[in-house]
Amino acid sequence: MSDEFIDINNYIAIVYTYKTVGISKLYEHYVKDQELLLLKGLIKGEISVLQTCNRAETYLYTYNKEEFKDFLQKLDEIHGKQISKDAMILKGEDAVKHLFEVASGLDSLAIGEYEILRQLKESIEKSKKLGLSSEKLEFLFKNAIKVGRKIRQQTEISKGKTGIYALAVEYAKHVSNNNIGNVKIAIVGAGEIGNKLALMLKNEGAQNVTIFNRTYEKALEVANKYGFKAEPLDFYKINNYDIVFVAIYYDKKINLPNPKLVIDLSVPQIVLGNNVITLENLRSISDKIMETKILSLQKAEELIHIEIENFKNEIIKYNQNRLISKFMKRIEDIREAEINRAYAEILKHANDKEEIKNIIDKMTNSMLKKIFSPLFETVRKNEDMANYINNIFEILSNGNISNSKTEEAKEK
């Protein structure tokens, strides 16, 4: 199959999740942008990564499957650690199915979470911006996002509180006896997670919240957005809060013994102690929620099976459109070349009407031969192709076809 067409068997997923390597080790499998750029030169195809707090996945579209073994070896070398041995490798339809499950919130630490849809969109946009991916992976990711939305509309998989951060806030509410408005809360980190926690706490009625961050200006920006306070990073001060949310990277382990509850969403975990809840603990809460959504999970799996078949049909349409475009471009190239040649000849015989007619006749004959000779040669060797051409001939047997029908045929 030509490289411009999509072959579902060329999709590959290299998967590490909280299930396969554990949350505490997951960060070791995150691939940096610089590493991806080096890897791109080693494979003929496209690359995109999806890295969240509960997964590190690399998606490939490769034109040469033999290169994949070398790719894994180079991945280990460039990463500086043998991570390929921990990978779950999925190919073709299995890779597509997995991404559809991820997009639908089925393969998540928090079943039914919405956040993954935004993460998928940002992942493919980033890989395109870095020059790592193009149409093939974009086609897959866009379809996955579409499937994810459809599953949520047709099932109750996302009913109730979903998302790992929502679970964290719910746990904090439980510990505070649903009186979170009067609790002294610290959020350590003013990045994406810190922002989300601040918004959720604001919506739950929290009032006494302070944002701590290494860069004070960033903490102040988040605090001002939600009407909270801001402080530079200071664990001595943080230790005096009732509930603490932590979402930063820190190269040392610390203890915060005074708070009633510390929810550490950092990867890897940085806070130690009996008062600490981690992503791993939240996973057990998520598992209990999953038990209440068994019917939705089953329905979602059935829908995904249908959507995979729909995806295959979308690939057929994609390839048909590419084939038509390729065919029409070739015809246009021939047409332009013949017009230019005929025009040059006509200029030589501007006053000879019979000769001009002869030139036009030769031009059209030449065009027909160049367009259809390769096709007819294939027909002679292929009975199925001959039957196909015969069907086309029957459709056009009256000698013409309306413009509207032509457009309709092109769309199909």
UniProtKB/Swiss-Prot annotation:
GO terms for molecular function: glutamyl-tRNA reductase activity; NADP binding. Keywords: NADP, Oxidoreductase, Porphyrin biosynthesis. The active site is at residue 53. Pathway: Porphyrin-containing compound metabolism; protoporphyrin-IX biosynthesis; 5-aminolevulinate from L-glutamyl-tRNA(Glu): step 1/2. The record marks 98 as: Important for activity. Substrate binds at residues 52-55, 108, 113-115, 119. It comes from the Archaea. CDD domains: NAD_bind_Glutamyl_tRNA_reduct. It is an enzyme of class 1 (oxidoreductase). GO terms for biological process: protoporphyrinogen IX biosynthetic process from glutamate. Possesses an unusual extended V-shaped dimeric structure with each monomer consisting of three distinct domains arranged along a curved 'spinal' alpha-helix. The N-terminal catalytic domain specifically recognizes the glutamate moiety of the substrate. The second domain is the NADPH-binding domain, and the third C-terminal domain is responsible for dimerization. Belongs to the glutamyl-tRNA reductase family. During catalysis, the active site Cys acts as a nucleophile attacking the alpha-carbonyl group of tRNA-bound glutamate with the formation of a thioester intermediate between enzyme and glutamate, and the concomitant release of tRNA(Glu). The thioester intermediate is finally reduced by direct hydride transfer from NADPH, to form the product GSA. This is Glutamyl-tRNA reductase. The gene is hemA.
